[in-house]
């Protein structure tokens, strides 16, 4: 018996010390859990809350908003049983660039150790993509679990690819026409067009920032992760390390065949304007565009078509053809160029992926730059005209349950509809990545006089009230040589509960 005892002890020690056996066991357990998990009842609490069943999660649920100027760069940290996992949502800046992008990417490297579970590119705008391009070599060293991109950029979709090419062609022509403008409105319109192209006027670069960013996202990361193209209503595939730790629902963009992407990038009735919406000129005067382009007085500023009369309406034999666009541009009055720039900007914004995460019972909504066409798809579930019929019960349920809201389009009035803000959970925390003034003290976009300033002051005030002062803006902190926005008014002297600031970012940690 004395000889058997040592054998038993040795066997135990060998079992504990063998890396092969220890590694094999967790793999089997993990595989078993993945097979069992989908058998949960859809209505069960664990399924709804996005909780990890069994074991102890490590880390805290946190959103980090990097301070890069007028653009989006968000890092969502998700606690899991194998430790914190990271989701990067957009990385770009355009107008209002405060030159902190490189430093922020280095902080991302330090925080994630070049490992990202998921990267999401919401839409094709430089202020959401340019950081990937300007830091291409750094990002090329990252290991990524999966990449999600709006399906409007899916190269296998012929219709989407054709429309993307048309937008690029129109943007290039607009860039040339607007390049000579020295007025503020013209320069802001030029900035919108360059945001769509990802390339500055007069540059010798053969590849724009947006295309370079797409190249990184689709094939440039170190481990060549799988890429998925999504639209609203689809059930996205989560990377393995996030399965069981969270759930995700895609609310936008509208399906490609719904027509709502082009139903209108604006709806002034749903905006935070001081006065009633302009009546403008009769709608029948405003139809020089093919049906893809919004063409009613609600979609364009009154001045955009001041030179038009019904009898002088432009007739196009083949709407949407390159020749038709050329003719339209040649005949365009200056304000029509501005309206076209707005249309390009709004159309790309409406292609934004709108992502609803649920983790540890908390709900987080990231809306990209979604404007009216995108919002109306899931707010109402049907085409809306005339009087507001009231948002759907499903939309009310989502908005009333939110614990975190990423303010749309940097605080623009055309991307945060009145009924959506009114339906927000009053205890919801909100972050707005924006820049109210560039280094010269000018606004990157819009004007207070025309009620188009970004961020829209009236909207920000309403968001403050609705969230009970749980709204924080990125331009409220100084970064590097850049001072806080004059609109900060000492807002960050005392941060709202669970917010904290670093040299380059603002964090929000969810209370347990």
Task: Please give the residue ranges for each predicted region.
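Short, flexible/disordered intra-domain loops and linkers
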Residues: 96-99, 158-166, 439-454
């Amino acid at each position: 018996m004395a000889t058997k005892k040592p054998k038993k002890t040795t066997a135990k020690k060998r079992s504990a010390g063998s890396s092969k056996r220890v590694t094999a066991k967790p793999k089997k357990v993990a595989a078993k859990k993945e097979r069992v998990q989908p058998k949960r009842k859809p209505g069960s609490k664990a399924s709804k809350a996005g909780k990890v069943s069994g074991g102890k999660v490590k880390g805290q649920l946190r959103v980090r908003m990097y301070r890069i100027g007028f653009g989006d760069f968000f890092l969502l940290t998700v606690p899991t049983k194998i430790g914190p996992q990271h989701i990067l949502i957009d990385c770009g800046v355009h107008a209002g660039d405060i030159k902190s992008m490189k430093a922020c990417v280095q902080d991302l490297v330090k925080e994630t150790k070049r490992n990202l579970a998921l990267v999401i590119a919401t839409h094709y705008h430089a202020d959401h993509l340019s950081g990937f391009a300007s830091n291409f070599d750094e990002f090329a060293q990252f290991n990524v679990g999966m990449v999600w991109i709006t399906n409007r950029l899916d190269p296998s979709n012929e219709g989407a690819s054709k429309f993307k090419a048309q937008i690029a062609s129109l943007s290039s022509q607009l860039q040339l026409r607007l390049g000579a403008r020295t007025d503020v409105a013209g320069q802001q319109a030029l900035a919108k067009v360059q945001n769509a192209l990802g390339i500055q006027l007069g540059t010798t670069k053969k590849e724009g920032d947006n295309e370079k960013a797409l190249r990184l996202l689709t094939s440039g990361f170190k481990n060549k992760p799988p890429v998925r193209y999504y639209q609203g209503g689809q059930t996205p595939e989560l990377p393995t390390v996030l399965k069981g730790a969270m759930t995700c629902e895609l609310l936008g963009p509208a399906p490609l065949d719904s027509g709502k992407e082009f139903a209108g990038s604006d709806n002034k009735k749903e905006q935070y304007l001081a006065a009633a919406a302009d009546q403008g000129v009769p709608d029948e005067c405003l139809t020089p565009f093919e049906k893809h382009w919004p063409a009613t007085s609600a979609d364009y500023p009154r001045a955009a078509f001041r030179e038009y009369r019904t009898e002088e309406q432009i007739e196009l034999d083949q709407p949407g053809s390159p020749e038709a666009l050329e003719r339209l541009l040649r005949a365009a009055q200056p304000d029509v160029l501005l309206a076209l720039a707005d249309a390009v900007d709004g159309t790309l914004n409406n292609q934004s992926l709108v992502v609803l995460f649920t983790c540890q019972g908390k709900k987080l909504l990231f809306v990209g730059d979604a404007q009216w066409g995108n919002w109306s798809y899931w707010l109402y579930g049907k085409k809306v005209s005339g009087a507001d019929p009231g948002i759907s019960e499903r939309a009310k349920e989502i908005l009333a349950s939110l614990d975190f809201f990423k303010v749309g389009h940097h605080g623009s009035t055309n991307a945060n509809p009145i009924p959506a803000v009114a339906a927000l959970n009053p205890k919801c925390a909100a972050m707005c990545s924006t820049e109210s003034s560039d280094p010269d003290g000018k606004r990157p976009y819009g004007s207070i006089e025309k009620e188009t300033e970004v961020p829209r002051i009236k909207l920000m005030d309403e968001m403050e009230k609705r969230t009970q002062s749980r709204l924080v803006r990125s331009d409220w902190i100084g970064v590097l040589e850049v001072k806080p926005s004059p609109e900060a008014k000492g807002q960050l002297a005392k941060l709202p509960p669970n917010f904290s600031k670093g040299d380059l970012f603002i964090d929000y940690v969810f209370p347990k």
